[in-house]
Structure formats: structure tokens, C-alpha cells
């Protein structure tokens, strides 16, 4: 019996030892590709040991698969600590996929210990010759060194734009020499060739500009001078090589292609790659004709690691499946570090992707994940995921989770998000994204989920931008943005950007359970329909929610244009889509330019401003059960604890708790680093104390006149024009200030309000006398009766050509606006060096009772000659938001 038991145990041990296991291969910097790669260390007589390269391990797996010797469980390739300089990108194809029952796992031995380097280390530095040294500022001359990159075998330097060579020093990218070192130079003039006007802004499509800065004299003789600018809009940039430069005139001519949006006065730019501007440690310049790189090292380069980017990428996967890349550091690519195209069941985890001239990860396919990675110091985007089929609404099931993406878009500055989702049914969850000049996240397609992410300190170099952005489509519906935390986002120079930006009629999106703190235009609906803003908390946002009706206003041309084109290009008429989104079937017959189906419910708004809803949009918006400017009963708002107490009045409106403890990064065995540091970038916005509180603006005493004493003829003969009694429109609502200041006088006879506006005219430029708001010389004023609660804001416009209108933009109903339009009287004339506009507005037509004492009021001057908008009072929002402007005293 004892003998039988012993045999049984022996048989069991033998059978367990024969159970199949993954193939084990090893790679080490001390290895050799002639060794078998099956042991982690070198054996006796150098006959065994690890491989030297990943490519050799990959090829070994291919050979074993072909010979039928690859286990069904796949393979694990363990890569020892060290830096692996790549001669070419590490490429995996369909032939490198895992077997049906297993995976191929490439595993680094430790976090941040295994680096795949697509760059070339630089060790040979020499003094700068006297002729070149003389061009360098004296402060830098004792410190600069140079390196001949051609001596390293490099001949392709690219251009100093996206995809060009970059320099890295001890783990951080160094900036090309530039002026100014921080900030920008303003464009003072553009060419008169190929002129254009866009949204009232004049410019030129020809790439020639003028500027005024005495520093420009230094740049004469620069062999490879470049500029980087936001040439027309602050959300569109381009880099230009300078082909002609006149330092006396401050004139530059750029190489083609010119910027698609053209160039305008007041745009901003800087120059770079100048030998004469190496004036700070870390700055460098490359002469592409000679391959000489000159730089001021932050410290002794002999005691640092210095490398330049060389290869277009570090790793590529093409139609690969069932592969894991675990724990690698990827660096030194000129383009995107890791590209994965058409992959299935691929995992990229615990990685560090940094110091690349392009993006971090671009992945398309299905059922794949990017988990626990750190991505930073990137020239372009962070993580791009694209998967799923819109025709069948089949989900891609791509996931980005627990990643930290920061300090990206260093070269390509705009529309390079930290994380983007495209296709159908992909997820971005519990990521942290911070420190970027433009957007944090972007999405397009259907049915994505963006949840539990933290975003801050983005859009710091842009204004018409969104921390989370999408736009211009009725059909890309079904995405949910929930339980995210957006904070400290205020735009370039504090002029304001957007938190979640549904641009240009984007539709069918749900924004729920998010926390917005100190975000301008936090939840922004740009004319789209069937959007929901529900159960969010807004703290010190200006405003919390925005809805406009651009589809029946300035963007109405897009309705029969790009919007209809994209509708017809989608499968919206298929049975599946008809069932899922029946609204699309009749959209073209249902006022498609209006934001119908907008729901704003159960939100909490504290501080800042609650809403900015355009008048034409108001009938399309359902506002209900929102808690505005009441104490919601936070646990400890001063310390950032926005949980609700048990006695919170928000519970009465059905507010659902937000899972604050689950937002953002979390400690996990797959996290590349822990803990994480992410300091908030200093705000460019004015401090809260500088923003006027509601109803606390300055006052203007209206003159009393006898009925009939003022005739509306566009002349000033009936007025006492004392400059000391004038209302002055002297501050810009946006853009550059005008050198001219318009003056206004107001009077009241007990039955009507009178307004005379005197606007100086530029003698060198004719008045624009049409009736299109924003495109003509005109003014607008807005007012409401402060003695009546929830009284409408009336918004009237007068044009230099004599036309006038009463509009609904500020919230008056169409019937109310029409009643005022019929009752008011307006005239305009040209008088010497000014034009005059004169209004009479019967108070009864506005529903204002006799004896009213105070009107909230603001005045806005549109001057086309210098493309300015000058106002009486800054509101921190729309000019017509008169509760934050000034007050007329009628008595």
C-alpha cells in the first residue's frame, strides 16, 4: 500500500512538470544575439545567455512558431535593465501575435529601468569658433559648445517643426533659441495683397508681416530663421521659415505654404532657431546646412546624458493581436513613440513615454488597453484611440485608464489632446491630464464614455478652445461625460476658454455628475440639440452653462453646408440608426439650426455666474430644478471637500452624490509611478475680487428733458453735449483697444429713454454702412428694469447707415423684441469727424412702468476700421449681461 502511494505521488509530480508553460526568453544589454536567449545570464564558455536585442527575441518566436515549437500559452520575454539604442523601430506584425490560447508578453524587469531609445547619444562637444561666437550674446559666450551631428552619421535633420530633430538633456527637452524667451511679439501690419475679412476681422492671405521691435536687428544674417505664430485665430498656429527679412522695416516674408486662415494685425508670434538668441541655459540652434548644433548646456555635458531624436517612432504594431508591452520607457522618436494599427487584444501597460518630438501612443483596433502609463515631454498628443464601426455601432472597446498625461503638445500646440477617443464605444477612465497649451481631451463618433478623469492647467495658450472638445456634427451622438473633475482652466491671458465644449451644433451628448471649479464657460453648448447638462457642480465658473443658437445666426450657412453633408454621409437612414436616434430622421424639417431638446437640470452653481443662454435659444432649453447661488451645504468647500451634508437642500432637487473618491489616478501594481506630482499652473485670469458682483456696477445719472424737446434726426442740436456728463466707451470687450473713444448721453422725459452716441471716424477708412451685426459700424445697448424681478433684457442695435433692430440675444422673447422694434425710433448721420446715432425708446413698449428709477445698462461700440469692440463696462461675460455692467439712474 505504501509502495502504491509512493508511485502515485511520483506520477503526479511528473505530470505536473509536463504541463505546458509559456516560452521564456531573455534580453539584456550584456547579451548576444548569437546566444539561445533561454537563460537570463551568460553561461559557461559563452554558449548560453540572453539575447542582445528585442528584434532577435521576436525573430526567435517567429522561428519557433514556424517549427511548431511555440507553446499554446505563448511566450514571456524578460528584458533586463538598461538602455537599448535602436537602429530601427521595433516592429511587430500579424505574424508576431499571440497563439489562440495565450499571449506574447514583452516585460521590462523594473519600472523605468528598461529604455528603448530611438535617438542618438551625443558625447563629442567642442568650442564654438570665433566667427560664430561673435554672433552669440556675450552672456552665453563663455558657456556655449557645439557638436557636429554629421560626424555621428546623421544627415537628415528635418525642419524645426513637427517631425524635426529635438535635443534632450538629462531627461528633459531643451528649447530652441527664441525671442522673446517667454511671450510673443505682436504683428503690427500685414500685406495689402490677397486681403480677407473673417467675422469682421481684416487680414491678408499673403505671408508677409511687419512688427516693431528693436531686437530684430540682431537677426540679420541668420541662416535658418523661423517663426511660430497664431497668425489669425488663437486656436490655429503655424511655423514658417523666413525667406526675406528687412530688419530696418521689421518686415518678414515667409516660405509657402502660407497660413490657411491668413494673417492679421494684432496676432502674436515669436522667432526661433536663432544663433543670436542663445541667451539662456538650455537654448540651442541647429544649422541644417552644416549639421552644427550649438547650445548652452544647463551643466557640464560630460556629466550628463545628451541625445537627439532620430527614428520616426520607437515601436510599431501592425494587425498584431494578443500582445502585451509591460513596463518599458520609450524615448527619442521624432514622431509618435508607439503606433498600433488594426490591433486586437493588445495591452500597453505600466509604460513611460517621454522625450519624443511627436505624440505618445496612436492605437486603432479593438479590445485593447493603455493602462497605468506616464506620458510627458511630448511634441504632440498623448494617447489616441480609434476603434469601432459607426455603421453597425459595434463598439471598439478600447480603454485608456489610470494614465498621467502632462507637458505635451510642446511642438504642435493646438488640437493635440492628451487623450482622444474616435469611432464607437471607447472609454477614458480615471486619467490625469494637465499642463498643455490647448485641449486635454477630444472625441468624435458615438457612444464613448469619459468618466472619473481629472483635468487642470490646460488651454493656457488658447481662448476659443475646450479642455474637452468636439464639434460640428448632428450624428456623432451617445457619448457620456460623467463624474470628471475639471479645475483651474481660464485660457490665454485669462480671457477665457471652455471646460466641456460642444462646438458648432454638436448634438446628443450627456454631461452629468461633473465637478467644475474655476473654469470659464464650464459647460458650453454651441448651438447643438438633444444635449443634457445634469447633476453637475459648478464652483466659481463664469458662466457655468452656455447655450447659443448659432445655427440660426452667424453659423447658419453651416446648416445646409457641412452639417447636412455629414448627416447624409452617415448611416442615419438605416434601420439600426432609425431605432437608436429617431430624431435624425426629421431633423432637416425641424428647424435644424436651433438647439432643440436641450435639458439643464439638477445642477448646483455657487459663485461666478450661472448661465449665458442666448435669447433665440431660450425656447429650446428646459431649465429645471437647479440650485443657483444658494448654500448647497458642502462638507468643507474652503478645503475643496464638495461632498454634500445630510441637510443639503440639493437633495430636494434630486441631486445624486458624485463619487469624488474615485476620480483621478489610483495606486495600483500597473501604475508606472506613485505618488504623482501635478502642481496647478498659476492662473492668468484676474483674481475673483476683480470681477464685479451682480448689481454693483457704476451709475450714470440720466438727464431729465421735457417731452418733445428731442427730435430723432441723428443730429445733436437738441442735446447739451457736455463731455464731463458723457458716458465713455473706453475699454475693449475683447481683442485690441481702439485709440478712439465713443461718447454717449442719455435723457428721459418720463415716457421714453433717449440715447445719443458719438463715434469718431478714422479719416483713412470708410464707414461700413450695412445692417449685418459684427460686420458693420454700429453700436448696441442693453437694459432691463431693476424694479421688476426677472424682467427681460432688451437688446437694441443702431447702424451707421441708419438701420436699427431689436434682437432676442439677451433673453427678450420674440414678441417682446418685436414690440420694442415697432415702437422705437432711430436715425444716424455723419457729422464731421464722427458719426451720430440717436434712439428714442418708449418705456411702456418695454413693460417699464412710469416712475421706474433704475435700469441695468451697458453700451457696446463696433468699429470696423480697427476691428474693435469698445464698451462702457466689462461684464465678465456677454456685453448685454447688464446685471454685471452699470446702472442708469432715472431719478
For every predicted segment, state its role.
Residues 241-244, 283-285, 440, 743-745, ...:
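Short, surface-exposed charged micro-motifs
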Residues 1-4:
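Positively charged n-region of N-terminal signal peptides that target proteins for export
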Residues 115, 251-253, 292-294, 522, ...:
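General beta-strand recognition
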Residues 689-891:
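Structural preference for beta-rich elements and adjacent junctions enriched in aromatics
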Residues 22-347, 352-354, 362, 556-579, ...:
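Extracellular polysaccharide-degrading/modifying enzymes targeting complex plant/algal/animal polysaccharides
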Residues 6-17:
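Bacterial N-terminal signal peptides
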